[in-house]
Amino acid sequence: MDELKKTKELVEKYLKKKYPDAQFTDEDLEFLARFSVKKEPKEREILKELGLISGKGTVQGYYANHKSVKNAKDCIQAIYERFNTKRNSQKEKEHPVDVFGDDFEAFFAWWCEKTPEGGIRKCCYCEVDEDTVRAAFAKDEKDKCVISSKKRSFSGELQIERKNPNGDYSADNCEFACVICNNAKSDMISAEDFKKFFVPGIKEYWAHIEEEIKKKNP
C-alpha cells in the first residue's frame, strides 16, 4: 500500500474516534497526513497543491472556513508535542531508551490504537477516564483545584506508562496511565501485583475525587 495512503487512513481512523460528527474531505485528510503527521514543510503550498486554497487565499482564511480541520491539526500537533517532549527528555539522559524508533507516525499509530471510540482514554490500571483527571486538576476562578501539585509533570493529562520500566517506549510496551498510578507503580512492583494490591485503593480515591468535583461544580 502506498505510504501516503496508509498515513491518510491512519489520520481518518483517529479522527473518526476523536471527532465522530466532523466531516473531512479526501483532500483534508491528505493535508493533515502530509503536514501534521509526516511534517512536510510549507503549509500554504500543500493547501494550494491540493486545491484547498487558490489565488490570494490564505492559510488563516482556510482554517476560518474549515474549523474541523483546524481542530484536527491542533490536536495532532498536541500529540506530536507529547512525542517530542518524551524524545528530547530521553536524549538528555545518561542511558536513554528508544522512543518509537524516533518516528512520530509510529507514535501516532500507537496513540490512535489506544484511543477508544468517542476519544476518551482511560488509565490502564484503575480505569479512571481522562475527563475526570482533567476536571480534578482544572483551576477555578479562585485558582483552586481539587488536586494540585508543584510538579509540572503531575497534571490532568494521562501519562505514558512503560509496562516494563527497563524497556523502550514502543507500541507493545506502552499504555496510558493516570498520574496516581503512574507514580505509585515502581519497577519493584509487577503490573499484576499492582492491580491486585494497589489499584482497589486508587479506585476508591478516584471515587472520592469524583464526589469532590461534583461538590465543586454542582
Where are these regions (language model features)?
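Histidine-centered nuclease catalytic patch
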Residues: E105-F108, C124-F176, K185
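Charged, low-complexity interaction regions
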Residues: Y19-F24
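Glycine- and charge-rich intrinsically disordered segments
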Residues: M1-E9, K13, N217
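A detector for short metal-coordination/catalytic motifs
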Residues: D168-P218
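Short, charged surface segments at domain edges that flank catalytic/cofactor-binding sites
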Residues: K70-V128, V133, N166
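Secondary-structure boundary/linker elements at domain or insertion junctions
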Residues: K6, L15-K17, R34-K42, K48-D98
